Curated annotation (Swiss-Prot):
Keywords for the protein's UniProt record, in alphabetical order: Cytoplasm, Endosome, Phosphoprotein
GO biological process assignments: regulation of mast cell degranulation
Disulfide topology: none
InterPro entries registered for this protein in UniProt: Fy-3
PANTHER family linked to this entry: PROTEIN C12ORF4
GO CC field: cytoplasm; early endosome; protein-containing complex
Localization per Swiss-Prot or TrEMBL: Cytoplasm; Early endosome
Pfam families linked: Fy-3 (PF10154)
In-chain residues carrying the UniProt-annotated modification Phosphoserine: 79
Quaternary structure and interacting proteins, as annotated: Component of the FERRY complex composed of five subunits, TBCK, PPP1R21, FERRY3, CRYZL1 and GATD1 with a ratio of 1:2:1:2:4, respectively.
Organism (species): Mus musculus (Mouse)
Function: Component of the FERRY complex (Five-subunit Endosomal Rab5 and RNA/ribosome intermediary). The FERRY complex directly interacts with mRNAs and RAB5A, and functions as a RAB5A effector involved in the localization and the distribution of specific mRNAs most likely by mediating their endosomal transport. The complex recruits mRNAs and ribosomes to early endosomes through direct mRNA-interaction. Plays a role in mast cell degranulation.
Protein name: FERRY endosomal RAB5 effector complex subunit 3
Keyword Phosphoprotein: yes
Length: 552
């Protein structure tokens, strides 16, 4: 279709106009390139002036020129449309992709499907939300968010049940076909059925994906409008009934907090906390925590609304627009997507609750992909310039080849950031790219993963992130090669490097007190955990405790 369009765009036609001056018959010939971008009136004026044409043909020439441009443009559009239809019929163009593009264009340009005009939420909504979350209406907001979360969770549960039933049904069908393989059916029949099953799963997943996307969009719009309206109503001093309603509202979820907490209690976490001092001249004090926990536990919401759960959620909401943000580090591969591993698990957690303040995780990743594509393009052009400049250094040439080899992916040590308001205890996720080298036992302080941690801590200093959770062993799951000596060496390396980075931080931000949480996988033993806990005071200068006793 693009080729056809280019052919018509480059077409040149000759405009012929015949007129008579006295007894002499004259003819004006002007080549025009279509589509004509210039205004017909302007073009007519230029022709009159350029060719010194008599004034009595001015009106007739203008009509003839306008008619010629209109007829030829219409003919081009008709030919272009015919070529596009032929491309669709011949299979040159993907019909499903074309239909999706048309549906999107129709929804974006048709008034019936257009969203109502909204104020700029970015600043107004942020200020309004910050005021309300620090007012008696805070629990009302959290209760509404929790109701929305339960609604989306139920929708996701229905999706999972339907997908499970489809896979079970397809499994039974495939078993029957495999039993007949070689008798009445061939490999081609099996492949055809497998393709049908895959297409059915894709259609069902797309259907539920669109439904979830629509539901979250509706929830987000309703929530923002409700927050703005509530803020306006609270400004009215005569609205006492609303104030009473807000004060009474919070108690509705408290009746079974303790029982629900016991029912949904997770695997017991191990935790040790330390207060440390860094620096000799410019002394700074920080909090360190060592935890045995799943990294995603800091992201997941719970269906119950117990007091402990609500406290964490309230703290996260209170600090959303503050200078005390919370972040965590996820170790990911070099592809910017959410299709596999912990990336998929994290995206699933993000989808369980509507984000009322930031774009969806998929939209944020699309922006990251565009930025990464631009950065990779710049990197490739610089590598090409370095080669063309005649630099014969072998090491430099290897680096250039390595950059080209990784042209479509980010490199180990690089990271991208996503923002969230819908996660349990964090606001910012650092997606740090690592490779299989982190599983070896010979990485050094100059390893890309370690340098990536340094850059992440620097971003924390410059962007008000005062709490950061780091995987201590630079892995999320244990494997056979990760023996006790391996764990001790890796923990010592990360502890010492982070200590050095935190001392650097004092010069970056003036010595603001921060909390660094070191997480180890849940599969690690208690004995190993306490060995790591005993190692920490040997590397960091831990504050001594004072015991106060009363004299009788």
């Amino acid at each position: 279709m693009k080729k056809n369009r280019e052919r018509f765009c480059n077409k040149e036609r000759e405009f012929v106009y015949k007129f008579q001056v006295g007894r002499e018959r004259l003819e004006l010939r002007v080549p025009l390139r279509f589509p004509v971008e210039e205004n017909a009136s302007h073009l007519h004026g230029r022709l009159m002036l350029l060719h010194s044409l008599p004034c009595f043909i001015e009106s007739d020439l203008k009509d003839a020129l306008s008619r010629f441009i209109e007829e030829e443009s219409l003919r081009d559009h008709d030919s272009d449309a015919e070529a596009c239809l032929e491309a669709v019929k011949s299979g040159e163009v993907d019909l499903h992709q074309l239909a999706s593009a048309w549906a999107k264009a129709y929804a974006e340009t048709t008034l019936e499907h257009a969203r109502p005009e909204e104020p700029d939420w970015d600043e107004d909504f942020a200020d309004v939300y910050h005021d309300l979350i620090h007012s008696p209406a805070s629990e009302t907001l959290l209760n509404l968010e929790h109701n929305y979360f339960v609604s989306i969770s139920e929708l996701i549960g229905e999706r999972d049940v339907e997908l499970k039933k489809l896979r079970e049904r397809q499994g039974i069908e495939m078993e029957k076909v495999m039993q007949e393989l070689g008798k009445s059916l061939t490999d081609q029949d099996v492949n055809s059925l497998a393709a049908q099953h895959f297409e059915s799963q894709q259609d069902l997943e797309n259907k539920w994906s669109n439904e979830l996307k629509q539901s979250t969009a509706i929830q987000k719009q309703e929530y923002q409008e409700w927050v703005i309206k509530l803020h306006q109503d609270l400004k009215n001093p005569n609205n006492s009934s609303l104030s009473e309603e807000i004060k009474v509202q919070p108690s509705q979820f408290r009746e079974s907090a303790d029982a629900a907490g016991r029912i949904y209690e997770e695997q017991r976490k191990l935790e040790e906390s330390f207060t440390i001092h860094l620096g000799a001249q410019l002394k700074t004090m920080h909090n360190l925590r060592l935890l045995r926990a799943d990294m995603l536990d800091f992201c997941k919401h719970k269906r119950t609304h117990g007091s402990g759960v609500k406290l964490h959620r309230l703290q996260t909401a209170l600090s959303l627009y503050s200078t005390s943000l919370c972040g965590l580090v996820l170790l990911v591969d070099n592809r910017i997507n959410s299709y596999s591993g912990i990336k998929r698990d994290f995206a699933t957690v993000c989808q369980e609750c509507t984000d009322f303040h930031f774009p969806r995780i998929e939209e944020q990743l699309e922006v990251v992909q565009q930025v990464a594509l631009y950065a990779r393009t710049q990197r490739k052009s610089k590598c090409k310039e370095a080669r063309d400049s005649g630099n014969q250094n072998g090491g430099s040439d290897d680096k250039s080849k390595n950059a080209e080899r990784n042209y479509l992916n980010i490199l180990p040590g690089e990271f991208y950031i996503t923002r969230h308001s819908n996660l349990s205890e964090i606001h910012v996720a650092f997606h740090l790219c690592v490779d299989d080298n982190v599983k070896s036992g010979n990485i050094t302080a100059r390893d890309p993963a370690i340098m990536g941690l340094r850059n992440i801590l620097k971003v924390c200093c410059t962007h008000d992130i005062t709490t950061i959770s780091i995987p201590l062993l630079l892995v999320h799951d244990m494997s056979e090669e990760m023996t006790i000596p391996w764990c001790l060496r890796r923990a010592e390396l990360v502890f010492k490097c982070v200590k050095g980075f935190m001392m650097e931080m004092a010069s970056w931000d003036g010595g603001i007190s921060r909390t660094v949480q070191f997480l180890v996988p849940q599969s690690i033993s208690e004995e190993m955990f306490y060995q790591l806990s005993n190692m920490l005071p040997q590397i960091f200068r831990v504050s001594s405790t004072l015991t106060l006793t009363s004299k009788h």
